[in-house]
Amino acid sequence: MRVLITGTSSGIGKAIAEKFLKEGFDVTGFDRKEASISQDSYTHFCLDIRDREQYPALAPFDIVINNAGVQNENDIDINLKGTIAITEAYGIHDAIRAVLMIGSASGHTGAEFPEYTASKGGVLAYTKNVALRIAPYGGTCNSLDFGGVLTELNLPVTEDQKLWDQIMDLTPLKRWMTVEETADWAYFMTVTNRFCTGQNILI
């Protein structure tokens, strides 16, 4: 099967791509940065998901995973509008198996910066919209809304001992997720799962 994943050059997106490659899938990655994966079954395109004119014409994908995201002045344009643009271009067709959004706990809790929270909240609503539209094709659409994940992006948090201790006091398992665990969830929701759809899963 063919999988499209955005934001594959680092962090969660890279881990998801590596998981699907390990399982024998053909993976296409979109990222503004150069490829950090070198495998025969991996194809990489350097592009900005905000610019639809950069989107390549590609054969239909079985699975589309929207992972690309930022936390800056481009929150709405990338996290929400970019996710919508990618999905509309590659995820809405009669052979689609699954569309997955990588959301955020902030979309549920309202924490973080206003624009970021709004962008992720929009993704939660759009997930339900897509689920209804691809259900007639047997496709599913869900979002995985992670809290703390051990990525380079979160180093300012994990390396601040006082802040980290405060977070761990509120965390029952006393740790954050690894990127490999996020990849396992992504694989389960798009490959193993064939019935759950339209759900925003807070982890």
Model-found features: residue ranges?
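C-terminal substrate-recognition "lid" of short-chain dehydrogenase/reductases
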Residues: 175-203
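Short, flexible catalytic-loop segment of classical short-chain dehydrogenase/reductase
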Residues: 145-156
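N-terminal Rossmann NAD(P)H-binding glycine-rich loop of SDR-like oxidoreductase domains
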Residues: 9, 17
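Short, small/polar-rich loop/turn modules that mediate ligand/substrate recognition or access, typified
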Residues: 135, 140, 196-199
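Conserved NAD(P)H cofactor-binding loop of Rossmann-fold oxidoreductase domains
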Residues: 67-72
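Catalytic loop of short-chain dehydrogenase/reductase
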Residues: 98-122, 127-136, 148-149
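Conserved active-site helix of classical SDR/Rossmann-fold NAD(P)-dependent CH-OH oxidoreductases
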Residues: 18, 84, 121-128, 132, ...
